């Protein structure tokens, strides 16, 4: 894990994830479903390696992900030994329509623990759009994930379902484990203007920025800064603020309890663009 080296970088944190699983379970499909980022591997001269970058927004911080897929090659051990250096997370992928790919998870986990012990992992059941051909019951996969102590997702690159959500959850686990979430120390050198904006939006909700006695251009910048950077500390402390006016016409901020958003996507998510039977 690393932070950007200059304020001009387009991300706040950089994480390296490995996609691991048998061949033909759809790992390349997952990478191809990502529209942003580079697709050409810096090590394209090595066969059997797929590579993609993408940037996600996590608690207001921009997290750039480097995603590596070894494509289940027989020389996985040699490749993984090289690519596991500096890896912060592993995505275990199986095909829900291929029983053999699920039963091979123990073999992959053993190799991961041999070369990268203790690296955070999530279990991903791919090709949910083929649920009518399902060979791995969701309940069985969920029980297996609970036994491993990892988070479980079923995803569909075709429907763009749970792809970003699964990456975001693994990034959250990694950042919290290393205590590098946005409540920690600043991840880059800020300009004076950004420091001023950080101070203001840290105690002012975005919907109250319009009420501040500031020029309209500055208020607009503050709102954009607040939404893009996610610097409103109330989201992590479980607090919100409301503007109250006393009888002396002086405004003040008072704290109001709010419910923090769940760390995993809801089960009734309808973001997918196709019907899953």
UniProtKB/Swiss-Prot annotation:
Residues bearing a lipid moiety (S-palmitoyl cysteine): 269
One annotated GO biological process: intracellular signal transduction
Lipid-conjugated positions (S-geranylgeranyl cysteine): 274
InterPro entries: P-loop_NTPase (IPR027417), Small_GTP-bd (IPR005225), Small_GTPase (IPR001806), Small_GTPase_Rab (IPR050305), SOCS_box (IPR001496), SOCS_box-like_dom_sf (IPR036036)
CDD domains referenced in this protein's UniProt entry, alphabetically: SOCS_Rab40
Regulation affecting activity: Regulated by guanine nucleotide exchange factors (GEFs) which promote the exchange of bound GDP for free GTP. Regulated by GTPase activating proteins (GAPs) which increase the GTP hydrolysis activity. Inhibited by GDP dissociation inhibitors (GDIs).
Keyword Hydrolase: yes
Propeptide: 275-277
EC number(s) reported in the record: 3.6.5.2
NCBIfam families per record: small_GTP
Family label: Belongs to the small GTPase superfamily. Rab family.
Function of the molecule: RAB40A small GTPase acts as substrate-recognition component of the ECS(RAB40A) E3 ubiquitin ligase complex which mediates the ubiquitination and subsequent proteasomal degradation of target proteins. The Rab40 subfamily belongs to the Rab family that are key regulators of intracellular membrane trafficking, from the formation of transport vesicles to their fusion with membranes.
Protein name per Swiss-Prot or TrEMBL: Ras-related protein Rab-40A
């Amino acid at each position: 894990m690393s932070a950007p080296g200059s304020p001009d970088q387009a991300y706040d944190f950089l994480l390296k994830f490995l996609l691991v699983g048998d061949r033909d379970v759809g790992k390349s499909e997952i990478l191809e479903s990502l529209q942003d980022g580079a697709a050409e591997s810096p090590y394209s001269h090595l066969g059997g390696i797929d590579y993609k970058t993408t940037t996600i927004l996590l608690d207001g911080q921009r997290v750039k992900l480097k995603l590596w897929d070894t494509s289940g090659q027989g020389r996985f051990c040699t490749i993984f030994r090289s690519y596991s250096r500096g890896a912060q997370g592993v995505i275990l992928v199986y095909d829900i329509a291929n029983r053999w790919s699920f039963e091979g998870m123990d073999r992959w986990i053993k190799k991961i623990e041999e070369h990268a012990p203790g690296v955070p992992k999530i279990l991903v059941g791919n090709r949910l759009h083929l649920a009518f051909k399902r060979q791995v019951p969701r309940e069985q996969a969920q029980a297996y994930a609970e036994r491993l102590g990892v988070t479980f997702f079923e995803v569909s690159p075709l429907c763009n379902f749970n792809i970003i959500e699964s990456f975001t959850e693994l990034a959250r686990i990694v950042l919290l484990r290393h205590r590098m979430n946005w409540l920690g120390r600043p991840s880059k050198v800020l300009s004076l203007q950004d420091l001023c904006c950080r101070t203001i939006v840290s105690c002012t909700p975005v919907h109250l920025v319009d009420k501040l006695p500031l020029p309209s251009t500055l208020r607009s910048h503050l709102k954009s800064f607040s939404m893009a950077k996610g610097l409103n500390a109330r989201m992590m402390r479980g607090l919100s603020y409301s503007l109250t006016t006393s009888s002396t016409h002086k405004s003040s901020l008072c704290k109001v309890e709010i419910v923090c958003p769940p760390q995993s996507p809801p089960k009734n998510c309808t973001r997918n663009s196709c019907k899953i039977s």
